[in-house]
Amino acid sequence: MGGKLIVFEGVEGCGKTSQMQLCSQWLESLGVSVVVTREPGGTELGLHLRRLLLEKAEDKPVAEVTELLLYAADRSQHVEQELKPNLAAGKYILCDRYTDSTIAYQGYGRGLNMSLINQLNYIATAGLESDLTIWLDIDVEVGLTRKRGDGIALDRIEQETIAFHRRVQQGYAELAASYPSRIVRVDGSLSKEAVQQVIQEILRVHLKGLP
């Protein structure tokens, strides 16, 4: 059975982490070898970049293009160190965010040049695309309310304006419309159990070779 890259995307508080954990447990119960990872922060270098990207610094804000380049650096290291080797070993990779996040957040959210973003994504990934992307679609205000309810301080991106997060959401909607064979929308407002059931059905349909 060949390796597969399955990406989970969505706005803040959409439930990616919980659904990835449930999906990993399900796949492992089928005898599938699973790797769970994330961007940013899927490598040792990435952990340092994650801190730089997400910590709030009022007096020294991260410039928007700098932010874009840091995400690209994290992704390049992640692809070479984690994604390619594990795919070659036949593993199923569940990845929390990938290239679509950069398009949605830095492209739609920040308004940066989309051509530049696409070029950087291609350079960072060497053309490696996901086999399937699960987009957990939830209203941005509901998602942010969930995040605040976690009792953990919001990071720099989570503290952006509602308008920013709505632009990000629009980015995901347009990406899903543009790449329907790769990106599948899941209603993230359903119960955790219902969302997981839908995800399992999607994986069985889209990924051949599951036991």
UniProtKB/Swiss-Prot annotation:
Keyword ATP-binding: yes
GO CC terms of this entry: cytosol
UniProt-listed Enzyme Commission number(s): 2.7.4.9
Group of enzyme by EC: transferase
Keywords: ATP-binding, Kinase, Nucleotide biosynthesis, Nucleotide-binding, Transferase
Recorded catalytic activity of this chain's protein: dTMP + ATP = dTDP + ADP
Record GO terms (molecular function): ATP binding; dTMP kinase activity
Keyword rRNA-binding: no
Biological process according to GO: dTDP biosynthetic process; dTTP biosynthetic process; dUDP biosynthetic process
Residue sites binding ATP per the record: 10-17
Tree of life domain: Bacteria
HAMAP family hit by this protein: Thymidylate_kinase (MF_00165)
Family: Belongs to the thymidylate kinase family.
Role played: Phosphorylation of dTMP to form dTDP in both de novo and salvage pathways of dTTP synthesis.
Descriptive protein name: Thymidylate kinase
Native source organism of the sequence: Nostoc punctiforme (strain ATCC 29133 / PCC 73102)
Taxonomic lineage: Bacteria, Bacillati, Cyanobacteriota, Cyanophyceae, Nostocales
